[in-house]
Amino acid sequence: MMSIKIRVRIAASLTVMALATTLAIAQTPATPASSLDTLVRAEITPFKGKVYLFAKNLDTGAIYSFNGDERVRTASTIKIAVMIEAFTRVAEGRAKWTDELVLTKAARYGGSGVLPELADGLRLTLRDCVNLMMVVSDNTATNMVLDYLTTDAVNARMSALGYKNTRIMRRIGGGGESKEGKEPDNKRFGLGATTPHEMVQILEKLEAGEIVNKPAAKEMIDLMKREQARYAIGRTIPDVPMASKYGALDRLRSCVAIVYSKHGKIAIAITVDEMPAVIWSVDNPGYLLMSRLAIALLEGLQSAQ
């Protein structure tokens, strides 16, 4: 017969093993079912181009990643970092929202926005330029803000916040290169670089009120809710509230957003790049793919609750 001492030791060992298993489960963020991965890969596999994405249910901690830690070109999503530096500068008392910025030929750049249609010499407040940068993705307004803040200051802010991958390399259209932008290895990124994972981390901190301060973070989220373009993540859910920023370059499309859906608050960052054709249309295949992926992510991450 098994001795009492042996039985006690076995029972103690089993108790420790059970406790360790319980702790491991408790400390591991919820992950989506394999069905979500199957749906995502079914969309991505036939797509002509490269796809990078990261998503997180901010209520449950459930995550999904596909190349989410790969560094990618940002296009206009880097404007989120510029916005954060502007709000921080004002909060620190080193800038005022009423500070005037002057529209010049050097700042002028087309592609999106309204300022390229207006005359040089126009004076706008810092507040106006930041609003234009985020709501209508005005490239000229962005350059005006960057001339005021500097690209190096934006990057220093990202470093201070712990974001090592998110960097702006230069002004839109060229000039104003940051220190990182002058590095040969970074030339391939053009305007800016980030990872989908890091963009979701930034969104999560903004939503939690942990960037600058709670009132400023809320104001930034509210500003992103006013973005007028819903070409990608919010394309097929027009009535669902969303705080977002999209971006477009030649063969690239990107979008980062917090979707305030019935499934919970889902933060999503998607970049598609190296598409075979340059298509300047709201029906760009990249936008269409992102809209389908967003629906799968919203439903799949909700199922992990």
Predicted regions and their residues:
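Active-site SXXK
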Residues: 61, 73-101, 268
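Acidic helix-start/capping segments at beta-turn-to-alpha-helix junctions
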Residues: 58, 97-114, 149-150, 171-176, ...
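Mid-domain, small-residue-enriched loop/turn segments at the edges of structured enzyme/sensor domains
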Residues: 50, 122, 130, 143-203
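Second-shell loop/turn segments in exported
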Residues: 28-30, 65-73, 113-120, 128-132, ...
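Active-site-proximal loop and beta-strand segments within enzyme catalytic domains
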Residues: 88-127, 131
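Bacterial N-terminal signal peptides that target proteins for export
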Residues: 2-15
